Amino acid sequence: MSTQKNARATAGEVEGSDALRMDADRAEQCVDALNADLANVYVLYHQLKKHHWNVEGAEFRDLHLFLGEAAETAEEVADELAERVQALGGVPHASPETLQAEASVDVEDEDVYDIRTSLANDMAIYGDIIEATREHTELAENLGDHATAHMLREGLIELEDDAHHIEHYLEDDTLVTQGALE
């Protein structure tokens, strides 16, 4: 536990940024949106890691690798979100408790499910995050924060790409023969 008595920045407070010419009111709106995205992406990250660790079956290797890479992508997106929150004069959500409490996406429980169910759950979270990111991109643009909007668009491209891959994995076409399924 930290022995520091005086916090340099208080969670929930937004100063804005003179360097970025972003006043506290506009910055606070962006920070709130970015912190919500940060919480959601970290939930996604942990769920992807869970599925990466527990995947089994005929497509194990491909799915194991994909889920690991998708988790890395989610972590990179989360890092960009947190860095931008800080640049705008806010404090990024960091504790597991805060991240889970602030997430608007449903967290999968601790049980292990078949990979089709797991991927469907992942795709649902991706969909929720994609919708929120689009809304927050528009918010940032409307507030004149074009850099945040650009950063969100870049993350959105990565997240949409992984969601699209999951959609392909969930298709009915397979190389596994019917006999192997029985």
UniProtKB/Swiss-Prot annotation:
Alphabetically ordered keywords of this record: Cytoplasm, Iron, Iron storage, Metal-binding, Oxidoreductase
Swiss-Prot/TrEMBL GO biological process terms: intracellular iron ion homeostasis
Broad EC category: oxidoreductase
Major localization listed first in the record, in broad terms: cytoplasm
Documented EC number(s): 1.16.-.-
Cleavable signal peptide: none
GO cellular component: cytoplasm
Residue positions binding Fe cation 2: E83
Residue numbers marked as site, Involved in iron translocation: W53, E56, V85, Q86, H164, H168, E171
Cited InterPro entries: DNA_prot_starvation (IPR054862), DPS_DNA-bd (IPR002177), Ferritin-like (IPR012347), Ferritin-like_SF (IPR009078), Ferritin_DPS_dom (IPR008331)
Miscellaneous note of the record: The dps dodecamer comprises iron-binding sites for iron translocation, oxidation and nucleation. Fe(2+) atoms are initially bound to the outer surface in proximity to the iron entry pore from which they are translocated toward the inter-subunit ferroxidase centers via two discrete steps. Iron oxidation proceeds by transient formation of tri-iron ferroxidase centers and Fe(3+) atoms move to two distinct iron nucleation centers where iron mineralization occurs.
Protein name: DNA protection during starvation protein
Organism: Halobacterium salinarum (strain ATCC 700922 / JCM 11081 / NRC-1) (Halobacterium halobium)
